[in-house]
Amino acid sequence: MRNAASEMLPLYAIVAGRAEHIPALNDIELAAARLLKGYAPESVLRETSSAAELREAIDAGLLWVAVSDARPVGFAHAKLLEAGRAHLDELDVHPDHGRRGVGRRLVGAVCDWAAASSLDAVTLSTFRAPPWNAPFYASMGFRVLADHELTPALRRVVAQETRRGLDPAQRVVMYRGTRRSPAWL
């Protein structure tokens, strides 16, 4: 027998990003950023991806959008920073749709795409402390990279974040191989 409350939960689909999604994605980014108050400077919390950057990601097939009733509620934006690796540049879920597996499905879509594209790994940088950041990604098989493991491309990501005002001591760079191998077990 079905529970009435479970029948009211929204259904989510992960779709390829489209131009008509762009205005909603900035709203999602700002709403999700509010959860990081106290972890990031106010200036960073007000940043959003530019329309040009999102259009470029759409054209490259590197933007995944979670929709509910055809409305965007979250998104993942990946980049190809270096040969053989995708970098999860942005993951945001509107707080009204948090803790329902939307972020997990978006990360899964990026990792599935990377594996299907014969890429070796997915990397990302995130906050160390909030449970929906590094601990969340660790639960999905990502591991923290030590400083000596950072590639030149990942060092540039860290340097860019530092210039934006993010404290590198509060951040981690993480890695997940796309195949079960000793490199990411």
Say what each PLM segment does.
Residues 114-126:
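Conserved GNAT acetyl-CoA-binding A-motif
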Residues 12, 16-22, 26-95, 107-113, ...:
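Acetyl-CoA-dependent GNAT
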Residues 124-133, 150-155:
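Conserved beta-strand-loop-alpha-helix junction that forms the acyl-donor binding cleft
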Residues 44, 48, 133, 156-157:
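Short Asp/Glu-rich motifs
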Residues 2-7, 125, 139, 143, ...:
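Terminal substrate-recognition subdomain of acyl/acetyltransferases
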Residues 89, 99-102, 128-129, 143-147, ...:
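Short, structured secondary-structure boundary patches
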Residues 71, 94-108, 117, 128-134, ...:
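Conserved glycine-rich acetyl-CoA-binding loop
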